[in-house]
Amino acid sequence: MGSYRAEAQIAAPAHRVWNVLVDLDRWPVWTKSVRKMRRLGEGEFGLGSKVRITQPGLGTATWVVEEWQPNSSFTWTASLPGVRSVAQHRILPVAPGRVKVVLTIQQTGRFADLVERFYGKKIERYMRLEAEGLRRSLEGT
């Protein structure tokens, strides 16, 4: 089973961080870990939404939002043959106008160990890119 985590302290209130996280069209602007992100379907992004994400060197996967707590967290899952990925995005207040963003991915299934062996370092690096890119996009640094 692969387990990955990245976090960043961000000088911004939770609602601003949330607004950047749920603006799917902008992800390729603030993180190099995402080449393309496209919402499948109509309506607001939220519980049950499906998103197709293309990442350099990892290919394309469809993620489904399974948990949704506005201004706080969302969890989406993707399943490929032999591997199920569960990715959580949490925003934790640490002080007025300051939060800690915690990103986690858990991978399970018959081929999870192989994915970790061949792609684990890349997944870790991409998670750091996401956490730091989010911080930079909000702090302007």
Feature roles, as predicted:
Residues 77-129, 134-136:
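Beta-strand/loop substructures that line and gate deep hydrophobic ligand-binding cavities in soluble
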Residues 1-8, 125-128, 132, 140-141:
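Hydrophobic-ligand-binding modules of eukaryotic lipid transfer/binding families
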